[in-house]
Amino acid sequence: MAPKVSDSVEQLRAAGNQNFRNGQYGEASALYERALRLLQARGSADPEEESVLYSNRAACYLKDGNCTDCIKDCTSALALVPFSIKPLLRRASAYEALEKYALAYVDYKTVLQIDNSVASALEGINRITRALMDSLGPEWRLKLPPIPVVPVSAQKRWNSLPSDNHKETAKTKSKEATATKSRVPSAGDVERAKALKEEGNDLVKKGNHKKAIEKYSESLLCSSLESATYSNRALCHLVLKQYKEAVKDCTEALKLDGKNVKAFYRRAQAYKALKDYKSSLSDISSLLQIEPRNGPAQKLRQEVNQNMN
């Protein structure tokens, strides 16, 4: 039985959210429907509120297995506020459930253009890639629908929003570790990981470091045993001035290969940018023990020492 709530869009949405959390998806959907009718009857333009209501009702449909109506509501939500992460993820899940893998791939890929660390999108891309390779063969990418280019404004909007999705993003590294390190990769996983890493390397050569991070992340979901993939992703983080992420990736690389010179050098660079000069010098020292004549490391040591003086 739906709770009695007054005819306020905000209260109807809040009541719907509570029902959703309680697993009462039909009741939640009805409340979102009432809120939508009320909002539309007002005639006032509030596209963000309307988009959220469509997206929330889509989540109810998805939980109940009504993928067709989920897709319709997500599409309505995205028409009001393009490049919103939640409706993109929900529509991708619905497409995947209906085995419309190419369309699911496009939505997951669009999410990763907005935020390349959303764990559910990374995991979804990994699943869908396997399905597409199996069904369409090695040239499956040529058979995909066009993937929208996400404008910078949409990326900035997402980065500034204190939404629930950011809680997911904050947990991405641990989820990535769980998804990859909890199992031994198969031979097929290793091959896919290598292919994705090479795609990342090609993107780095073209100067597209953000896209390269996506490829390296997909590669690590297939197999987390390649030290070079972590250190390559660290390079991209350095270029994008994401220094803490660079430190994390170099640390993972060194856990796998304690003599990875590039990982030591890139972590030293990141520590220098973070003004952690002591840690930077420590990494440079470790590197020079492996390669005493490494010119870039010697130069970096001079720069760090100058900054300390």
Swiss-Prot record:
Residue numbers of Phosphoserine PTMs: S8, S160, S186
Pfam families named among the record's database cross-references: TPR_1 (PF00515), TPR_8 (PF13181)
**Cross-link (Glycyl lysine isopeptide (Lys-Gly) (interchain with G-Cter in SUMO2)) at residue(s):** K197
Read off the SUPFAM superfamilies from this record.
Answer: TPR-like
Q: List locations, semicolon-separated.
A: Cytoplasm; Mitochondrion outer membrane
A biological process from GO: protein targeting to mitochondrion
Q: Which GO terms describe its molecular function?
A: heat shock protein binding
Q: Is the keyword Lyase assigned to this protein?
A: no
Q: What keywords appear on the UniProt entry?
A: Chaperone, Cytoplasm, Isopeptide bond, Membrane, Mitochondrion, Mitochondrion outer membrane, Phosphoprotein, Repeat, TPR repeat, Ubl conjugation
Xref: InterPro entries: CiliaryAsmbly_MitoImport, TPR-like_helical_dom_sf, TPR_rpt
Where is the region Disordered? 158-189
Q: Report, as the record phrases it, the tissue specificity of this protein.
A: Isoform 1 is ubiquitously expressed while isoform 2 is expressed only in mature testicular germ cells. Isoform 1 is expressed in all testicular cells. Isoform 2 is highly expressed in early to late pachytene cells but expression is significantly decreased in round spermatid cells.
GO CC term (a single one): mitochondrion
Where is it chiefly localized?
cytoplasm
- Say what the protein does: Plays a role in the import of cytosolically synthesized preproteins into mitochondria. Binds the mature portion of precursor proteins. Interacts with cellular components, and possesses weak ATPase activity. May be a chaperone-like protein that helps to keep newly synthesized precursors in an unfolded import compatible state.
PANTHER family the UniProt entry points to: MITOCHONDRIAL IMPORT RECEPTOR SUBUNIT TOM34, RNA (RNA) POLYMERASE II ASSOCIATED PROTEIN HOMOLOG
* Oligomeric and partner information: Interacts with HSP90A, VCP, ATP6V1D, KIAA0665, AMPK, and DMAP1 through its TPR repeat.
Family membership: Belongs to the Tom34 family.
**Protein name, please?**
Mitochondrial import receptor subunit TOM34
Species name for this entry? Mus musculus
Taxonomic placement: Eukaryota, Metazoa, Chordata, Craniata, Vertebrata
Q: Which gene encodes it?
A: Tomm34
